[in-house]
Amino acid sequence: MAGAQRRDQLIGVARSAFAEKGFDGTSVEDIAARAEVSKPVVYEHFGGKEGLYAVVVDREVQTLHTAIREALMTPHAGSRRLIELGTMALLDYIESCPEGFRILTRDRTGGETGGSYGSILADIVTRVQDLLGAVFLHRGLDPKAAPLYAQALTGMVSMTGQWWLDNPQLSKQEVATHLVNLAWNGMHNLGKEFHLSDEAGHLADPERDL
């Protein structure tokens, strides 16, 4: 097997092992055995488990980051369409790369690999914040709240994606529909004045209760 092919084989084998057993539970021996090679072959290509793990994480980061960035930069798309596209980009990745998503969501190295799931979410939050800031100004809402809402929307989709990975009873389309329904209708119906219940539990606007 040529060097590049062997490298790709080891990356694929390692991705499955890391997704199944985690970083700490996976050894070079495990990876070599799965790939049917000797341990020195793994060390030759990656220098050890840490180097191989870094390559696996970096590949997944780039794949997911590119998909979501392209979705959120779709030209001439309105706010609702961008919510749909961003949501579907994440769910598409989870569906097609479940092993990669498992690795990213429990990545132990943080910034050491040149990127992580957290860095992807931070970039998404920034992009959503910019979009919401313009929308809030147009609707007469306080633009200073845009960062909070960007965090909330991004977290909602991200956490639901992690839940869906382990609870696939709903289809991807159903999950996306529910997420966009909640996100869009919640944002679309934001009021300029909203108050929490008082200490006695009385609602400021009971007519809007469920």
What does each model-found stretch correspond to?
Residues 1-5, 76, 143, 191-210:
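N-terminal intrinsically disordered/low-complexity leader segments
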Residues 6-14, 31, 56-68, 128:
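Generic hydrophobic, amphipathic alpha-helix propensity
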Residues 9, 13, 17-51, 55:
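Helix-turn-helix
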Residues 20-24, 75, 97, 139:
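Short coil/turn segments at alpha/beta junctions that flank glycine-rich nucleotide-binding fingerprints
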Residues 26, 30, 53-60, 67, ...:
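Alpha-helical DNA-contacting segments of helix-turn-helix folds
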Residues 55, 70-96:
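Hydrophobic alpha-helical connector segments
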Residues 62-66, 85, 113-137, 147-152, ...:
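Amphipathic alpha-helical packing segments from all-alpha helical-bundle domains
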Residues 93-115, 129-133, 159-166, 195-196:
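Amphipathic alpha-helical segments used for helix-helix packing
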